[in-house]
A protein has these predicted regions:
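Amide-donor transfer/coupling interface in amidating biosynthetic enzymes
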Residues: 104-199
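Structural motif
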Residues: 36-40, 72, 167-169
Length: 199
């Protein structure tokens, strides 16, 4: 909720009219009416339920992403963006919106984390707590890890950026702690909708 509140407040301060739409499993989702999609996390079981629902509209979601739709996906939502998430119980197919994958490994990566991201001038800060290790291949990371573990505890990078999609393990909440990232999302949404953004 903190990420949503931050987006709404920073729009309000600039006189940008915005509304929040919360979707339940039974709801129809029309991506043509959405400017920013927030995909949060949950337990593995909850993720599986949500993923099954989103798989039904995967083609529409993929079209939204490829048309520069803005998405911020945190923790479990980040894992869902990819091709699959392998746990000790089996393999959960992802939404295949970004060419990444996640595998559960022994031990959790828990700590404060600091990144340097190409998207914003200031360092990005947050808190990470994840058992999954995400591998992003040749994709652009959200940032280089200055302190903490990041995607897999080895690569030195955290998160992924694809077009106007950010996937990340950073809690905090992310956007209130990093208003520049919040403004980046708003600016991309305005550019997509109106062709320009003056923040």
């Amino acid at each position: 909720r903190g990420n949503i509140a931050c987006l709404m407040q920073r729009c309000k301060w600039r006189g940008i009219e915005a509304e929040t739409i919360e979707f339940e499993l039974k709801d129809e989702i029309d991506f043509a009416k959405l400017d920013i999609v927030l995909l949060g996390g949950g337990s593995d079981r909850e993720q599986m339920i949500v993923c099954q629902k989103l798989k039904e509209i995967q083609k529409d979601f993929k079209a939204y992403v490829e048309d520069n739709g803005v998405v911020i996906a945190v923790c479990g939502g980040y894992q869902l963006l990819g091709n699959y998430y392998k746990t000790e119980d089996g393999v959960m197919e992802g939404l295949e919106l970004v060419d990444i994958y996640t595998e559960q490994e022994e031990g959790r990566l828990i700590d404060n984390i600091v990144l340097q991201s190409e998207l914003v001038a200031m360092p990005v800060v947050g808190f990470e707590n994840h058992g999954g290790r995400t591998y992003i291949g040749e994709n652009q990371p959200f940032g280089k890890v200055l302190y903490g573990s990041g995607n897999d505890g080895k690569s030195g990078y955290e998160g992924v950026v694809y077009k106007n999609v950010i996937g990340t393990y950073l809690h905090g909440p992310l956007l209130p702690k990093n208003p520049q990232v919040c403004d980046w999302l708003i600016a991309r949404a305005l550019e997509r909708k109106y062709g320009e953004a003056d923040l």
